[in-house]
Amino acid sequence: MAMRELNADSCSSPQMGAMWETSGSVKENSSQSKKYSTKIENLGPESACRHFWSFRYHEATGPLETISQLQKLCHQWLRPEIHSKEQILEMLVLEQFLSILPKETQNWVQKHHPQNVKQALVLVEFLQREPDGTKNEVTAHELGKEAVLLGGTAVAPGFKWKPAEPQPMGVFQKEYWNTYRVLQEQLGWNTHKETQPVYERAVHDQQMLALSEQKRIKHWKMASKLILPESLSLLTFEDVAVYFSEEEWQLLNPLEKTLYNDVMQDIYETVISLGLKLKNDTGNDHPISVSTSEIQTSGCEVSKKTRMKIAQKTMGRENPGDTHSVQKWHRAFPRKKRKKPATCKQELPKLMDLHGKGPTGEKPFKCQECGKSFRVSSDLIKHHRIHTGEKPYKCQQCDRRFRWSSDLNKHFMTHQGIKPYRCSWCGKSFSHNTNLHTHQRIHTGEKPFKCDECGKRFIQNSHLIKHQRTHTGEQPYTCSLCKRNFSRRSSLLRHQKLHRRREACLVSPN
């Protein structure tokens, strides 16, 4: 009901123009329905939105035309032919969110042209925590950076970027910087490697130009070298650590320092939990590991899940630098329960899978039979069963054997009478999900398998194979008594019944 009260001002707000390009405009009021119908044909999204919510019953000649006009306006507004369901939902939620904001907040947020709900949320939260004197100035770090961390784009049309000014470090800031530097030294990280900032890599190429004023933060290097215990080989993982020089650290505001503090704390916690070792330039080994949620392959963007997690933790903290020593980071993490340390054998496959077994995605394990390659040896062992015919998994009830453990588990359900998959049309139950999907094609009429010879279609692939034998003349089923061949197993079974009947007649005294 609140959407019905959406006024014309909110429908014509700038965020609509940010999402879709406006094409054409018309006068809103018309007394004749035919003229009105002609006018709405070429409406742009903003005008269509405005007309949709302001449309009245008397503007049409009856209920049928009223519904028709509303459908046209809604279609021109939402553009379902070019936008996904998620985009349409995003647009509706954004419009409603802006329409229910207090008037002062609504005007200020609309002035900055949020492109999506996440950017609007950042703007509103920024407005709530900032004093009145600073509401009109929005810095790149306060909004653009947070928008990226929440999964949105860093730059929106209408944003006025204001670079943060360098501020002299006080006693607390010096202590905070020293803590940051100590952690870098503890982990053996180099603070002078140059690379592109993570948040810049998450921005569209066309929007990168708007971040030219942010070049003062360009020493983000995400790399660590891990030496795995025993005889395991060296693995290099990029996109793990964040680096700043002392001069760059002075330019960061408390919000940013809190962000980097949280990132390093998470890295250090998970580094210790795996019990691996890091090799630094001095040759000393320090216990270290890598958070699997933070690892990204080289050249990829920061994942949306990771960005949101970091942003939520950062925005929820008021006082940056609550933890002032590496030792505290290692000993206690009050905000979340520490995970049970995992062994290297448990975590290595995950790390190798995330990183593609090295920088090039190498697949060193090759099948000698067919030449197919695999990333880990266990996959090669499983694949080799196809060539050898090995079926190591045996059913204890019927002695049937299976190549994969998953197949044995599915088969076991048939003995137990478990049929968890139920058809919503007829109520029939099935033990396997694939059987349910095949059955539902009877109700939907779907026939995805087509014969290339005659064009006839079938519900199941097995039916297509049987049909194709009528074209090829193949007869794979042979009678063991008379050596007659058949194209279908059912035909062979009927034929074998004739043999049994003849034998019964010969044995019978009558």
Swiss-Prot record:
Alphabetical list of SUPFAM superfamilies matching this protein: beta-beta-alpha zinc fingers, KRAB domain (Kruppel-associated box), Retrovirus capsid dimerization domain-like
Start and end residues of each SCAN box domain: 49-131
Residue span(s) of domain KRAB: 235-318
Keyword Chaperone: no
Keywords: DNA-binding, Metal-binding, Nucleus, Repeat, Transcription, Transcription regulation, Zinc, Zinc-finger
Predominant localisation class: nucleus
Cited PROSITE patterns: KRAB, SCAN_BOX, ZINC_FINGER_C2H2_1, ZINC_FINGER_C2H2_2
CDD domains (alphabetical): KRAB_A-box, SCAN
Repeat recorded as keyword: yes
Positions with biased composition (Polar residues): 22-35
Alphabetical GO biological process terms: regulation of transcription by RNA polymerase II
Places the protein is found: Nucleus
Chain intervals for the UniProt region annotation (Disordered): 1-35, 313-342
PANTHER family to which the protein is assigned, alphabetical: ZINC FINGER AND SCAN DOMAIN-CONTAINING (PTHR23226), ZINC FINGER PROTEIN 75D (PTHR23226:SF272)
Family classification: Belongs to the krueppel C2H2-type zinc-finger protein family.
Annotated protein name in UniProt: Zinc finger protein 75D
Lineage: Eukaryota, Metazoa, Chordata, Craniata, Vertebrata
Gene name as annotated: ZNF75D
